[in-house]
Amino acid sequence: KEFGVESTDIFLPDCFGFGWTLPTIAAHCSLIGFSSQKLDWRVHPFFGKSKHPFTIGVWKGIDGSSIMLAHGYGYGKRWNDVDLSENKELMELAERTPLKTVYRYYGTGDIGGSPTIGSVRSVEKGVKGNGPLQIISATSDQLFKDYQPYKEHPELPMYDGELLMDVHGTGCYTSQAAMKLYNRQNELLGDAAERAAVGAEWLNLADYPGTFLTDAWKRFIYHQFHDDLTGTSIPRAYEFSWNDELISLSQFSDVLT
């Protein structure tokens, strides 16, 4: 269920702002949609009285390419065994958009974990319910697929610009640039080491160093955490992070040499 599945959307509930290049890069990677809930963390409104341009619509990138954008309304929502087809909060959220549609995250956000039993039962009751709301339990990209192609849906509002934060992680595209450099070097060197190791074993020149490579991968991937690689941790933390990144670079280099 986890492997061999191709993603068609960008699912970033808890990242720190989104550049104007994101829809362009996503569209050229054949992705069709993007969702987050982070913009509600803004201190000040950016679009009139709202913190985001719309809840569901189309986001245009710097070259005119576009993807669909949906606002997830918080990542820690829980319900306690209720019929969501009659949920007043969802009704109110639906009224905020001309589409009369709500894209809603739920589960145990931030600290991690699956949705509670009560939340799952609520969704199941909502799907089978007879209230005024039609509840659809779906993958994160289903809404985007339902509106394909976007050009045939003029009712979708469009935004052309950046979606930046004004607090909590602002500037993380450039903060701790060394971490970003080391991470990318490890990704490239790790890939090269894997290919070389497989080729060497196929030619009966050397045994595949599976344990060694796994250790190298895990050591630097561990730091692809959104308060580490992004550059939002305290300075002291990066003394440990840099060390791990450099050890992995050395390990991958050893495989190649």
Where are these regions (language model features)?
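Catalytic-domain carbohydrate-binding cleft regions of carbohydrate-active enzymes
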Residues: 1-257
